[in-house]
Amino acid sequence: MRTLTLIAIVTCAALVIFHAAAAEELEAQDVIQPEDIFTGVATLEEDRIFECSFSCDIKKNGKPCKGAGEKKCSGGWRCKMNFCVKF
């Protein structure tokens, strides 16, 4: 019984991780259907909350995610959880 419970928990955890990774990949590819109004709004709000909300002084390929004193990212860079991400 304990073995089955452990297998069920591990399987559920793996599915949650796989689903989160797939959602991140789809978000990065901007795959949002027009009929997904609520999903689109949630994605915009999420981007507004996380985009450049940290100092993001990390440099990627020698280019800063955002310039000194700037509040927004430029050049296609976005700050996500204090990492520079190219979109």
Swiss-Prot record:
Domain of life of the organism in this record? Eukaryota
Taken from the UniProt record, the cysteine pairs bridged by disulfide bonds within this chain are C52-C65, C56-C79, C73-C84
Print the keywords alphabetically: Disulfide bond, Ion channel impairing toxin, Knottin, Secreted, Signal, Toxin
InterPro entries linked:
Hwtx-2-like
Q: Does the keyword Secreted apply?
A: yes
Residue stretch(es) of the prosequence: 24-48
Molecular-function annotations in GO = ion channel regulator activity; toxin activity
* Location of the protein in the cell: Secreted
| Span of the signal peptide | 1-23
Q: Name one GO cellular component term.
A: extracellular region
Tissues with expression: Expressed by the venom gland.
User: What is the predominant subcellular site recorded for this chain?
Assistant: secreted
Provide the family line: Belongs to the neurotoxin 12 (Hwtx-2) family. 03 (juruin) subfamily.
Q: What does this protein do?
A: Probable ion channel inhibitor.
User: Which protein, by its recorded name, is this?
Assistant: U3-theraphotoxin-Cg1b
